């Protein structure tokens, strides 16, 4: 069977965005998971920033991974992927000029699209970890990303955190990013269909939601009617892999009968030690949670 080129996969993702359906992403974190996802018929995968941080650094999602480390993992996936893979490019690893470099490197890695978010990352001295950059700076980043891409089929998706904004503020931000030329709008933290409907009526570009399996947003037909084309439920496959590794090694050591077995969430918490990072951020940066 002939292999699809990176451009072919980008075109396939463009067709997905132009369709009238809603698709759920496979969590893709290495070449093997990319092959499995494609073989199982997933239409699109995503390399999450949080998952990349876990896979590469065994660190929590505190913007610790570097662009080069993230691109290396995306490149490994891009060598074998036969489904469109989106890259969660966080804040673009810096200012608008850094965003341009991010787009250049991830395009070469073979991703079909990438999200650039407007969270103030990495966490800044004396600021809240959920603070956002200004709309003007966010617009500049999207315009810079569009300028940097070579293959026009590469999708540039603007992402914002609906969980820390009023609905009116979300509309202002997303309309601004749409006007700047974003190929799609990604939102995390949308509460329910009522809020989504209020936002969607002001937008014409395809929408992407990070829902973490929010039970209030479980209706693919309704999502599709509102323009949602991509849904990220989370990264269950990655955490299942962590759990399977833990259980297998416990069995190998003869510890399977002990009562202190951990679930996937507990394992992630135990082995990334987020309390240390939170304490350091408070002590050295006066960062508020």
From Swiss-Prot:
Substrate binds at residues 50, 159, 235. Homotetramer; dimer of dimers. GO terms for biological process: oxaloacetate metabolic process; propionate catabolic process, 2-methylcitrate cycle; pyruvate biosynthetic process. Its EC number is 4.1.1.112. It catalyses: oxaloacetate + H(+) = pyruvate + CO2. Mg(2+) binds at residue 88. It holds the Pfam family PEP_mutase. The keyword Metal-binding applies. Keywords: Decarboxylase, Lyase, Magnesium, Metal-binding. Its cofactor is Mg(2+). This is Oxaloacetate decarboxylase. Catalyzes the decarboxylation of oxaloacetate into pyruvate. Seems to play a role in maintaining cellular concentrations of bicarbonate and pyruvate. InterPro entries: ICL/PEPM, Oxaloacetate_deCOase_bac, Pyrv/PenolPyrv_kinase-like_dom, Pyrv_kinase-like_dom_sf. Binds 1 Mg(2+) ion per subunit. One of its GO terms (molecular function) is methylisocitrate lyase activity. CDD domains: ICL_PEPM (cd00377). Belongs to the isocitrate lyase/PEP mutase superfamily. Oxaloacetate decarboxylase family.
């Amino acid at each position: 069977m002939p292999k699809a080129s990176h451009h072919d996969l980008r075109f396939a993702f463009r067709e997905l965005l132009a369709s009238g359906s809603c698709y759920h992403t496979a969590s893709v974190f290495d070449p093997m998971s990319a092959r499995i996802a494609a073989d199982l018929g997933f239409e699109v995968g995503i390399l999450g920033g949080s998952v990349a941080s876990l896979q590469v650094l065994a660190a929590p999602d505190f913007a610790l991974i570097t662009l080069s480390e993230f691109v290396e993992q995306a490149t490994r996936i891009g060598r074998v992927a036969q489904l469109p893979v989106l890259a969660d490019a966080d804040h673009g690893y810096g200012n608008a000029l850094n965003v341009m470099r991010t787009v250049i490197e991830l395009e070469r890695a073979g991703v079909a699209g990438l999200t650039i978010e407007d969270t103030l990352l990495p966490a800044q001295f004396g600021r809240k970890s959920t603070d956002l950059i200004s709309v003007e700076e966010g617009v500049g980043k999207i315009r810079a990303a569009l300028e940097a891409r070579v293959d026009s089929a590469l999708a540039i998706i603007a992402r914002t955190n609906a969980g820390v904004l009023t609905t009116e503020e979300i509309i202002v931000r997303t309309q601004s990013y749409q006007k700047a030329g974003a190929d799609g709008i990604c939102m995390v933290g949308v509460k329910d269909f009522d809020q989504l409907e209020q936002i969607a009526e002001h937008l014409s570009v395809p929408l992407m939601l990070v829902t973490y399996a929010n039970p209030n947003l479980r209706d693919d037909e309704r999502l599709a009617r509102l323009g949602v084309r991509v849904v990220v439920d989370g990264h269950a496959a990655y955490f299942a892999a962590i759990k399977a590794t833990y259980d297998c090694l416990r069995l190998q050591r003869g510890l399977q009968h002990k009562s202190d077995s951990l679930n996937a969430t507990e394992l992630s918490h135990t082995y990334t030690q987020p309390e240390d990072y939170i304490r350091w951020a408070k002590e050295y940066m006066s960062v508020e949670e």
